[in-house]
């Protein structure tokens, strides 16, 4: 489960940016194409934050919808996978606009 190491990295990032203060909430953005399972992150969060500045902090996960733009017709549309064809023209040349995110968006500290 790579979500455990991802969650450990999230805790490290939060600790480094909290300035020694206790963290009460973490807002994490996870894109639909990131390959990260939000439920697994939630499961790992309590174990990874125990006895740290984040102990007892709330984890709020914001899902980021995957969006793409067709290189041929320039249509923008929701993606469910990397290789979805354009629904407007059927083209497979699609640029991902969003949905790959995995970032700490915000920290609440005391």
Swiss-Prot record:
Keywords attached to this entry: Metal-binding, Nickel, Zinc
Binding residues for Zn(2+): 70, 73, 86, 89
Lineage: Bacteria, Pseudomonadati, Thermodesulfobacteriota, Desulfuromonadia, Geobacterales
Pfam families reported in the protein's UniProt record: HypA
Keyword Metal-binding in annotation: yes
PANTHER family per record: HYDROGENASE MATURATION FACTOR HYPA
Keyword Transit peptide: no
HAMAP family xref list: HypA_HybF
Function: Involved in the maturation of [NiFe] hydrogenases. Required for nickel insertion into the metal center of the hydrogenase.
GO BP terms, alphabetized: protein maturation; protein modification process
Any one GO molecular-function label of the UniProt entry: nickel cation binding
Family membership: Belongs to the HypA/HybF family.
Gene3D superfamilies: 3.30.2320.80
Superkingdom of the source species: Bacteria
Protein name stated in the entry: Hydrogenase maturation factor HypA
Residue numbers binding Ni(2+): 2
């Amino acid at each position: 489960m790579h979500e455990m190491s991802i969650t450990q990295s999230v805790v490290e990032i939060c600790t480094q940016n909290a300035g020694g203060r206790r963290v009460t909430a973490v807002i994490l953005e996870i894109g639909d194409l990131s390959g990260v399972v939000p439920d697994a992150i939630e499961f790992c969060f309590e174990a990874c934050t125990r006895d740290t500045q984040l102990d007892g902090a709330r984890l709020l996960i914001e899902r980021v919808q995957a969006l793409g733009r067709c290189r041929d017709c320039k249509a923008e549309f929701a993606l469910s996978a990397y290789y979805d064809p354009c629904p407007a023209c059927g083209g497979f040349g699609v640029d991902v606009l969003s949905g790959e995110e995995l970032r700490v968006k915000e920290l609440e500290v005391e």
